[in-house]
């Protein structure tokens, strides 16, 4: 959240989605929990949290942060893939959350994983996935991430994946209509074989990515047994705002919360749920 302003907006939105389903919740599974951006705050609030991730480094960092926060005794750390939940009985956790879109990185098992989340949740599920319609405009804007930079001169290794645009960037850009049509039809950002080859060469940090349509996500969750499914698209408003104004809105203390409130209301409207910055968020309850 110190590098990109869209992370601030996404986190604020997801916090509210999670808060809305916490009534009666004691136990939480955070699947694909990373360094504990959501699991540790929930543990601080008194919930019993299972923090599941496949990365040793993320688990180690999360443990360290949980200990520093004094909540390690309320957390269980599990090394596992989100595709390996078959061992958990039905209703193992009151709430299952999976945010920052790890479900989109387990293609072709994405629907299976969503079904597992619903199965092992007793009360509610909150999940975010990559958005097909939200991603599509990036085909026409190679510099889309720079709109959200907190500091245009930031020196961070992650920026090698987001090079600053130059005159050559725009002059050399050509639309690939065939690839764009393929993406709209399949939801796959790239051919899986191409992605695997790039990963082997160190040319991308991202695995095969499957991007959902909003109604597709809702259908899969409903068929698995989730009720009152609510969809939203965090970032639908902010992606229309120039970087200097975004920075003013988010870093002026008198404006920040009012702006985040407006973002949440706008981004939750059914008409824009597919046009979030990167993700579609879905939440729902068990009967």
Task: Kindly give the residue locations of the regions a language model identified.
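Class I SAM-dependent methyltransferase "Motif I" SAM/SAH-binding loop
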Residues: 32-34
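A short SAM/SAH-binding and catalytic strip from SAM-dependent methyltransferases
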Residues: 95-109
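Class I SAM-dependent methyltransferase SAM/SAH-binding core
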Residues: 40-84
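Short alpha-helix
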Residues: 208-225, 231
